C-alpha cells in the first residue's frame, strides 16, 4: 500500500496498480496515478469523480465511479464492497464471506444505533468511558481497524490518539506507562489471535492492573477477516461520533484538513 507520492521501484508494466480516492482529488493519490500511467502499469481507479475521473477519461485508464455518501469517512463501507466486487477475481474473499459480513453489520447496526441508548450499546459505552488520550492496542491482522479508529477519533472528535502493535509495544511502548499521563489504553483483541498474542494480552492486562491503570477491551466478532474488520470499524466509528457528541463537537467540519488542502 502506498500512502505517499512515490511508487516502489519494483513497479513496472507487469504490475496491477489499484488507485482509490473517495473524493477523487487527493493530491498524493493523483500523483501516484500519473506515475503508474507513465510506467505503463495496469491501472484501475476508484473515486466519486473529481480530478481522478477527468485524468482517467483523458488517458484511457480503467475507472469505476462510486458515489460519495455525505463525506469520505461515511462512504468507506460502500467503497470497500464496491471494490471487492470489481476485483473479486484477484482478491481471495469468497462471496459467502462478503454476505456474512453484511449480515453482521446489519445486526450490529441495531445494537449501536442511537435508538438504543442502553448499556448494551457497545459504541456508546466506549464513548462514555474515554476520559483522556486513547492509546489503541491491536494484534496482527486488525491493524486496519485500529488505524481507522485513530483516524476517526481525530476527525470526528478532534482528539489525539495513538496506536500500538501489541507485540511491538512489549519492546518499547510499554515503558511509557511508567510516567503519569492522561493516556487511556484501549485493547482491540481478535477472537482467533495467535496463542502467543493471547498470552501478551494477558500479560498486558496484568501490567495495567498492577499499576492501577484502567483499560478497556474490545473484542472482534467471530467469522472471517472481512467480518471482523468491518464490524470493528463500524462499532468504533460510532463510538467516535458518540464521543464527539459527548464533548459537544460537530463531527463533520474538518477545518484543519481544509487548511492544508488549500495550500497544496
Regions from the language model: what does each represent?
Residues 16-18, 135, 186:
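Conserved beta-strand elements of the Class I
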Residues 175-255:
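C-terminal active-site/capping subdomain that shapes the small-molecule cofactor and substrate pocket
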Residues 1-108, 190-195, 199-214:
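Glycine-rich phosphate-binding loops that contact phosphosugars or nucleotide phosphates
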Residues 1-5, 159-170, 214-223:
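A generic structural motif
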Residues 11-15, 131, 233:
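A short, glycine/Asx- and small/polar-enriched loop/turn
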Residues 88-183, 262-264:
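Active-site phosphate/pyrophosphate-binding segments
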Residues 253-264:
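A short, charged, Gly/Pro-tolerant segment at domain boundaries
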Residues 74, 78, 96, 100, ...:
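Conserved active-site and cofactor/substrate-binding residues in soluble primary-metabolism enzymes
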